[in-house]
Structures are given as structure tokens and as C-alpha cells.
Amino acid sequence: MGNMRSLVKMLMVVLFLGWIFVWIMISTNRFQNIWTPKLAKYLKTTYFGPQGMNLVLLTVPMMFIAVLSCVYLHTQKQPSQTQSLYKCREWKVKGRMGRVMMVMNPLGIVTATELTFSLLFLALLVWALSNYLYLSYHVHLHNHDNANDMCRWQAKFRAFGLRIGYVGHYCWAFLFFPVTRASTILPLVGLTSESSIKYHIWLGHVSNFCFLVHTVVFLIYWAMVNKLMETFAWNATYVPNLAGTIAMVIGIAIWVTSLPSFRRKKFEIFFYTHHLYGLYIVFYAIHVGDSWFCMILPNIFLFFIDRYLRFLQSTKRSRLVSAKILPSDNLELTFAKTSGLHYTPTSILFLHVPSISKLQWHPFTITSSSNLEKDTLSVVIRKQGSWTQKLYTHLSSSIDSLEVSTEGPYGPNSFDVSRHDSLILVGGGSGVTPFISVIRELIFQSQNRSTKLPNVLLVCAFKNYHDLAFLDLIFPSDISVSDISKLNLRIEAYITREDKKPETTDDHKLLQTKWFKPQPLDSPISPVLGPNNFLWLGVVILSSFVMFLLLIGIVTRYYIYPVDHNTGSIYNFTYRVLWVMFLGCVCIFISSSIIFLWRKKENKEGDKDSKKQVQSVEFQTPTSSPGSWFHGHERELESVPYQSIVQATSVHFGSKPNLKKILFEAEGSEDVGVMVCGPKKMRHEVAKICSSGLAKNLHFEAISFNW
């Protein structure tokens, strides 16, 4: 198994380096004028036409990597002794490369890996622009030798606008990789979609800036040569300028509404505007043409596979078992799941409640452990914003069921919670919730006597005393004393806006639990193609892409080639790229639907078993469940393990945690893992402390859902 993984990894590295090499060389004079004519003899066939070269050099390698990564990630889930040793070395390398290098706005927390790859990518963009400008100014402008200085200046100005657009195209080759939620590419470098959204934002800013400059330059150029109406031209056999104009208008709308100041104040406008990305892609592809579209096809193809599979999953109604209403007015929702659904700590689940919004989906942190809780999955929801406020109102009313759809779970492909000697978990407000799943996973691992558990220090800061109810969720309700006896947990809780414990507690502030009746259309959350089924996802990717190549080859050979004869100047320019997009969508639809339905049929037995289990519960809704320990309310005898939370917790009023003191006083551990989730200021403060070099045993990791 280890040899096969090494072989697959080596093959992926070779393919990726070759793919990057093509991107490096494609802007050079050697590639344009020497290599391209030679390659065209072999790759510009009657079956693929002018787009054949880009398909072979830039599309096939990355699609092949996506398939191989499914095999690699599948074997990673099969543990062995050699693999555990390999993982140890891998974590050490990731620790060094994940060290914080800088903390600054607007980039945020930048690790060594991020800084290295960002600088390399910027170098690639500068290299491409300089090469393209050299080609334009010193090679292509020889036709203007006899022209006056004004014509040469105009030609150079136009060339700059054209080439800056090419640089933006480079960004589009990577733009959709970070937002592919069930990506098989991101886990290869230890990333998740949620943690990679900032790369999508960076790429979006750079590409939109390049395209805006490209558009403005051409508008000025056409005004100078009295051809301003070219802005609205739609050439049948050449670049349709109007398509580019429409794409730019959509792009600016998406760009402006995604700026942090706009997005946070008017999230719904941002949300709905961002869903214009489909039109943006269509008009952009029409503008650049089929050959250039094939250069960026892999990340778009993989994104749409993921998007369609997510759509298929979201058509199912998920079985909501119960809802806890915390004294802090926050919620914990518990869903039924099949026992075959596995996920890692710090994972997230997307929720959709049609009675609140027909279109909106929102991500929430999973607090349960798939190893400890085989048949249920829980998420915590903070009441913040109009959507969560409406959900809270719904659940507070006298309802016996709620229609909910889910997507996910999504999270790290692997998460070894016991890899450090000690763990310091720093959370602010609802930022504590990802650490609940970490602690529950440690409880599960404590059942294995051979596992050495780290000492855990949970440092949490809350605005008000009633927010301490978050800590009631650390242990599952059915946990026993023996299950937590090996866990060395210490909690330091800070109440920043109150100087002492409230003397009284309002009745409506008690922790309440509501149970919901099962509905015929509800089903447990089951594994989706991705983290739980990498091989099947690989089958979807491979079959849909092979089908796409066959269909595009047939259409080109028997429909386009008889008209165009590979000249690229006779058959309609727009129709050519529409064929590529249409056939790609058809292949994704057919392949994904067949595999999804096949897997759904196989999962039916598991669904039936889970339904029997949840239906065996007597669904009565108590007015309130046992209250929170931190509100002095008595619990039932079987809830005695919760006393250990109180015993392990020190509550500090009227102050914030001294994070520098806490981190530097980490006792007697060579390897201290520091995880932080909360407000940006808190994350940045912890990152600066860990990167200061004063404590080399601190290994930093940030969990952020505020992008």
C-alpha cells in the first residue's frame, strides 16, 4: 500500500511540475514561435481542432491529477504502521511550513507555505506580463516600422491592454480550486475549502483588476482611433467584444459587492450577486474563445462536478432530531446520520431552511464526533443576522417539525488531535464550538489504552455570563464517568463585560431541548461523493471527462471540421465555445447522476436502520431540559459527568485573557499545539505570539469562518 501511494504521489508531482512548466513557458517567444508550430502538427487534429494543444498540455494533466488524488486520498484512509510513521514525518514538515511568517491587514495571517507560493505566483504573473510585452513591443511591432510615432504608441498601448488581460487569465486557471468544497486537490496540500476561501478572494481581486485595466485601455484605444462602437461588436468568426463588456459589468458587480465593508453590511446583496458567476463564466468563455477556455477548463470542470453533486445532496430533506436552546439564545441542532458517515473535528455543515429562505445556505460548526456519536450529528448556531434570528424564532415557537436540507460535512481530510504533547485551544464567543468536536474526539481516543492523550487547556472569552452555556455542550448527553476519566482537561473562562456572577436567572434563559417528530420524507444525513467516497468521486471525474473528450472529438470531426477545416476563422467563434460548455455540462450531468443514484441505492439499507433507531425515541417536547451548571440549575443523576466541567473550569470576571502569559507558560512540553478560533483581533494576537520566536515549541493553527 505504501509503495502504491508513493508511486501515485510521484506521478502527481511530475504531472503538476509539467503543467506549471507549460504555464511558465507559454508566454515566451520560444514557445509562441518555435514550439507551437511543431506541437500543432501533432496536437491540432481533425478531432479537436485548434483547441487540441491546450487540451493536451493544460487540461488533461490537471484532470489526471484530480483522478489520481482520489486514489491517493482513499489509500490515506487505510491506516498502517508505515503510514503512521509517514504521518509523523508529514506533520513535522507541515509544522515547519505552517509557521506564521507575517500578520498584517488586509492579508491577515500568512504562513511560510502561503508566503512562498504567493511570491512564486506573483513572480509567474510578472514573468508572463514581461514576456508578453516583449513579444508585443519587440517582435510583433515590426509591422509598424514605417508608421509614425503616434501609430506605434497606439499599437503599444493596445498591446499592453491585451497582455494585461492575458495575465488575468492566469488567475482564472486557479480561481475555482479553493471554492470546490469536496475538492481532491486541496487535501493534497493540507487545505480545506473553508480555509482556502482567502486564496479565491486574492485571485479574484488580481484577476478583476487586470480585466478592469484591460477594459479601460481598450475603451481609451478605441476612442483614440474613433472606433468606440467596437465595444458593442459581436464578430461571428473572431473575438466578440460585447461578450467581454457584459462579462466585465457582471465581474465589477460581483467584485464590488464582495468587498468586506459591503459584504458584512449587506450580506444578502453579496450572496445573490455572487450567484451571477454562471453568467460571468459563460460570457467570459465566449469572449476568450474555446482554445483559451480550455487553458482554464480543469478548475471550472471540477468545480461544476462538485456543485452538481452538492445540488443532488441538497434535494434530500435531513432528519432533524432535536434542538437545544441555550441560555445565550444560541442553538444546537442534532440530526440523524448513517453510521457510515465519517468526518473530522472542526468540520462544517451547510444548512438550508426553505421556510426562512428559498436560496440561502449557511455554514455552521459541527460539535459532535463521528467516532463517538455514530448515529447523530450536531451543529451550533449563533443568533447573529436576520437568517439565524428567524431560525431562532421558528424553533422557539410551538412546532413539532422543521424542513431542513444539508450539504456536507466538509473539513480536513485528516486531523490527528493527539499529535501534540499539549493542546492550547483559544476561543472567543462562538469560536469555542470547533474545539468541542476536538475534545469529543479526544474522549473517543481515550478508550484506546495505547493512545497517549495530550493535556488540554481551553481558554475561552465570553461577553456575558450566560454564554458559559456553550461549555455545557462539551460532553455528549449520554457520556459516562469512565469515558472521560482519562481526559486531562482544564478550562479558563473569561467574562469580559460582567464583574460578578448574576444572582438570579430568568426562566426563559434556561437551557431547553425540543424533540421533533420524524416526517416521511426525512432521511438521515448519509455519505456524499468526496471525503467518504473518494474512489467513487474519482469514477465521476474520470468518466465525465473521458465522455467529454469523446463527444467533443465527435462534434469537432463530423460537424465543425467539414466547415472550418481547422482554420479557426470560418466556423462561428461563439458556437465553438458554446459546444465546449454544453458538452461539458451534459457529461457532468450524466456521469454524476448515474453514480449518485447508484450510491443512493446502496445507502438505502443504512438509511432504514438509522430511521428505525431515531423512530424508537419517544418524541415528547419538555418545557425545559436539565439546566446549565453555570446557572445553578440541578441536573439528573445520569448527568453527573457534567460536574467535571465545573470542577475543571475557572471563571474570571471583568477581564480578558493574557494570551502571551498563558502561551509562554505552557509547561513541560516540547510540542504544544495552539489552535485559535474567534474574532480577527484574537487570532492575530495569538499568531503574533506564536511567530515571535520566543517560544519555539508553539505550533500555531487558526480556524476562521470570518472571511
From Swiss-Prot:
Residues 313-416 form the FAD-binding FR-type domain. GO terms for molecular function: ferric-chelate reductase (NADH) activity; ferric-chelate reductase activity; metal ion binding. Keywords: Cell membrane, Electron transport, FAD, Flavoprotein, Heme, Ion transport, Iron, Membrane, Metal-binding, NAD, Oxidoreductase, Transmembrane, Transmembrane helix, Transport. It holds the Pfam family NAD_binding_6. Induction: Up-regulated in roots and shoots by iron deficiency and copper deficiency. Induced by copper deficiency in a SPL7-dependent manner. Residues 30-54, 131-198, 298-319, 557-576 are extracellular. FAD binds at H362, P363, F364, T365. This is Ferric reduction oxidase 5. It comes from Arabidopsis thaliana (Mouse-ear cress). The lineage of its organism: Eukaryota, Viridiplantae, Streptophyta, Embryophyta, Tracheophyta.
